[in-house]
Amino acid sequence: MNKPINLLVGGLTLFAAQGCKAPKQASQQAEHPNIIYVFPDQYRNQAMGFWRQDGFRDKVNFEGDPVHTPNLDAFARESMVLSSAQSNCPLSSPHRGMLLTGMYPNKSGVPLNCNSTRPISSLREDAECIGDVFSKAGYDCAYFGKLHADFPTPNDPEHPGQYVEEKRPAWDAYTPKERRHGFNYWYSYGTFDEHKNPHYWDTDGKRHDPKEWSPLHESGKVISYLKNDGNVRDTKKPFFIMVGMNPPHSPYRSLNDCEEQDFNLYKDQPL
């Protein structure tokens, strides 16, 4: 990859340093940078270790949680950190609807969490979403991980007319191609809170059950996409990637919900 990458994690932004470029090339890259947007679910601002470190603790009016986040800490030291960025609707589906459309929840089609036991709440098919905008601007667009912006319907691609589970699911949903809003590469699901037993539907609607800790699996798929394994993207185009990781979303009941090495960091921590 010879284009700069802008990597965003929630309120953190990193602009990767690049070597010297010819003025024309630098101008073209500035107009069409590669972008990766990573948004873990329910990640509270205070739960980042760097807020307890020199250079950060005096920038906020709260005490950071006693957490171990070495990668985010290193990332923050190389980044622009936004200390007061806020969401006016920090609830899963409504926030995702706003993020994708730029609309308030009452306009995006997603005023409620997408759940089959509630009134229909689903991303508007006629909305121009961020993926549509980047696609029209000449980007190769990829979405990985949790979407949770579509209402569960009986549209299992491998079993037409049936739901993606044996019974009507409360949460999980498959997103068909016509509802992907500009994302030409797809490896996603609706919502499913078994972090060591995730599943995904790919671009062609094939289901994958990797039996792997979901953030680890998703990061591996993103890396594979970046390397263009299998020629899955047009290398002549800049890329726009969104990665919706489910953890640290609940549950937190047992080692089935987390990696043992992470559990061991906190097992003796008083509540």
Language-model features: locations:
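Formylglycine-dependent sulfatase
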Residues: 3-4, 11-13, 20-271
